[in-house]
Regions:
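Canonical Rossmann dinucleotide-binding motif of NAD(H)/NADP(H)-dependent dehydrogenases/reductases
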Residues: 2-44
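Conserved catalytic-site loops of classical short-chain dehydrogenases/reductases
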Residues: 8, 100-101, 124
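Conserved glycine-rich Rossmann-like NAD(P)H-binding loop of the short-chain dehydrogenase/reductase
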Residues: 39-55
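Rossmann-fold cofactor-recognition segment
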Residues: 61-80
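Conserved Rossmann-fold cofactor-binding substructure of NAD(P)-dependent oxidoreductases
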Residues: 77-94
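Conserved NAD(P)H cofactor-binding loop of Rossmann-fold oxidoreductase domains
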Residues: 105-111
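Substrate-binding pocket helix/loop in short-chain dehydrogenase/reductase
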Residues: 113-115, 119-124
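Ankyrin-repeat alpha-helix packing hotspot
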Residues: 131-132
């Protein structure tokens, strides 16, 4: 029995993609979810892309036999962020009755842009999502 058996973990930014050739392309959040799945935790995975969340759910359940709840959630939602987070909490409690750990992994950023090249708005979004979304 895994050390997280019966525990519930929320992991933000935990989607995964399957490439056209069938190869899995994970994320840091997906890697974290895999580690908790190996320890038999119930998982709540969040992200912006429903397809990536469904791919992650399917693979984690198939490989590790754990329960996975994918919840679409954009932690960069700005003023709506409280509602987004509350939806994740409510869905988790409804599905599993408890929350034992939160891994605040997701962060909005401008992909492929160096920090020096971020606009003020891009920088603010990265800071907001990284510090306040949890």
């Amino acid at each position: 029995m895994g050390i997280m058996n019966g525990k519930t973990v929320i992991i933000t930014g935990a989607g995964r993609a399957v490439l056209s050739d069938g190869v899995s392309c994970g994320s840091i959040g997906y890697g974290i979810a895999t580690a908790f799945a190996k320890e038999e935790a119930n998982l709540v995975i969040t992200g912006r892309n429903v397809k990536k969340l469904e791919d992650a759910k399917e693979e984690l359940e198939r490989l590790y036999g754990v329960k996975v709840l994918p919840v679409q959630a954009d932690v960069s939602a700005g003023s709506d962020n409280k509602a987004v987070v509350q939806n994740v909490v409510d869905a988790t409690i409804k599905a599993f009755g408890r929350i034992d750990a939160l891994i605040n992994n997701a962060q909005a950023s401008a992909s492929g842009v160096t920090l020096a090249d971020h606009s003020t708005e891009q920088f603010d979004l990265a800071v907001y999502s990284g510090l306040y979304a949890a």
